[in-house]
């Protein structure tokens, strides 16, 4: 990885990461077990979001 990354490459990277996170969130919403309460799922997502950023 180059030491000085060009701005367009950084923007493409950020956009790709945002899209990947959105896809993962959609998959989590669609395929999460129904036995898990929505409150617990929301708490887990909040903790994960705070840890990620």
From Swiss-Prot:
One of its GO terms (biological process) is proton transmembrane transport. It is a single-pass membrane protein. The gene is MT-ATP8. The chain crosses the membrane at residues 10-30. This is ATP synthase protein 8. One of its GO terms (cellular component) is mitochondrial membrane. The keyword Membrane applies. F-type ATPases have 2 components, CF(1) - the catalytic core - and CF(0) - the membrane proton channel. It comes from the Eukaryota. Mitochondrial membrane ATP synthase (F(1)F(0) ATP synthase or Complex V) produces ATP from ADP in the presence of a proton gradient across the membrane which is generated by electron transport complexes of the respiratory chain. F-type ATPases consist of two structural domains, F(1) - containing the extramembraneous catalytic core and F(0) - containing the membrane proton channel, linked together by a central stalk and a peripheral stalk. During catalysis, ATP synthesis in the catalytic domain of F(1) is coupled via a rotary mechanism of the central stalk subunits to proton translocation. Its main location: mitochondrion. Belongs to the ATPase protein 8 family.
């Amino acid at each position: 990885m180059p030491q000085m990354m060009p701005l367009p490459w950084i923007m493409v990277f950020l956009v790709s990461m945002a899209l990947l996170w959105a896809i993962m969130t959609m998959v989590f919403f669609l395929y999460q077990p129904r036995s898990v309460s929505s409150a617990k799922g929301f708490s887990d997502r909040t903790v994960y979001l705070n840890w990620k950023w």
